[in-house]
Amino acid sequence: MGNIMDGKSVEELSSTECHQWYKKFMTECPSGQLTLYEFRQFFGLKNLSPWASQYVEQMFETFDFNKDGYIDFMEYVAALSLVLKGKVEQKLRWYFKLYDVDGNGCIDRDELLTIIRAIRAINPCSDSTMTAEEFTDTVFSKIDVNGDGELSLEEFMEGVQKDQMLLDTLTRSLDLTRIVRRLQNGEQDEEGASGRETEAAEADG
């Protein structure tokens, strides 16, 4: 699938943006390498359901472009640049990668249903006019052109862009505004943090 940024790089960001993001990144992650645990802690993603935890792990993996188990500064900037400045096509490619849990280049019903359930568990404000099962059925009935029960990247890209309802729903359900706001403002979830961290550690153990 190639680079999901499609050529977008740090050079396209202003020096001010890069400096601010670097300062925040190094403040939160002095080692220069963000682990999955730190990723979850920074965004206040604690005490998650199994579905929500899987979604967070999958999101982390899609931002870990070189697959070394860490998010470094370049990957961090690429991820933020995608969210803040990415075009529809670039975001759809990222959505596809997020849904393609096993990384085989196709999305099957179980993968889509799992991520939709996870998104709703972590973001209750997302669109809920349909159940996760109904939304999954709708997606496949509309854009699984060859009817093989799997969505290729081409089917996903073309189908979603042709259907405004699907595009709007996906955009709302994968709204990363909260995460971006935390990164931009350097906000920390201080209230009750120590107690939740203890609970999270116990849950992870």
Swiss-Prot record:
Record-listed Deamidated asparagine modification sites: 3
Lipid modification (N-myristoyl glycine), residues: 2
SMART domains named among the record's database cross-references: EFh (SM00054)
Molecular-function annotations in GO: calcium ion binding; calcium sensitive guanylate cyclase activator activity; guanylate cyclase regulator activity
Cellular compartment(s): Membrane; Photoreceptor inner segment; Cell projection, Cilium, Photoreceptor outer segment
Residues annotated as transmembrane: none
Disulphide connectivity of cysteines: none
CDD domains per UniProt: EFh
Main location: membrane
Residues that coordinate or bind Ca(2+) 3: 144, 146, 148, 150, 155
Keyword tags: Calcium, Cell projection, Lipoprotein, Membrane, Metal-binding, Myristate, Repeat, Sensory transduction, Vision
Region of interest (Disordered), ranges: 185-205
Expression (tissue specificity): Detected in the retina. Detected in rod and cone photoreceptor cells (at protein level). Also present in certain pinealocytes.
Cellular-component GO terms for this entry: cone photoreceptor outer segment; membrane; photoreceptor inner segment
SUPFAM superfamilies listed in its UniProt record: EF-hand
Positions annotated to bind Ca(2+) 1: 64, 66, 68, 70, 75
Ranges where the EF-hand domain occurs: 14-49, 51-86, 87-122, 131-166
Keyword RNA-binding: no
Residues holding Ca(2+) 2: 100, 102, 104, 106, 111
GO BP: any one term: visual perception
First and last residue of the signal peptide: none
PANTHER family noted in UniProt: CALCIUM BINDING PROTEINS (PTHR23055), GUANYLYL CYCLASE-ACTIVATING PROTEIN 1 (PTHR23055:SF13)
Task of the protein: Stimulates retinal guanylyl cyclase when free calcium ions concentration is low and inhibits guanylyl cyclase when free calcium ions concentration is elevated. This Ca(2+)-sensitive regulation of retinal guanylyl cyclase is a key event in recovery of the dark state of rod photoreceptors following light exposure. May be involved in cone photoreceptor light response and recovery of response in bright light.
Domain notes: Binds three calcium ions (via EF-hands 2, 3 and 4) when calcium levels are high. Binds Mg(2+) when calcium levels are low.
Binding partners and assembly: Homodimer.
Protein name, UniProt field: Guanylyl cyclase-activating protein 1
Species: Bos taurus
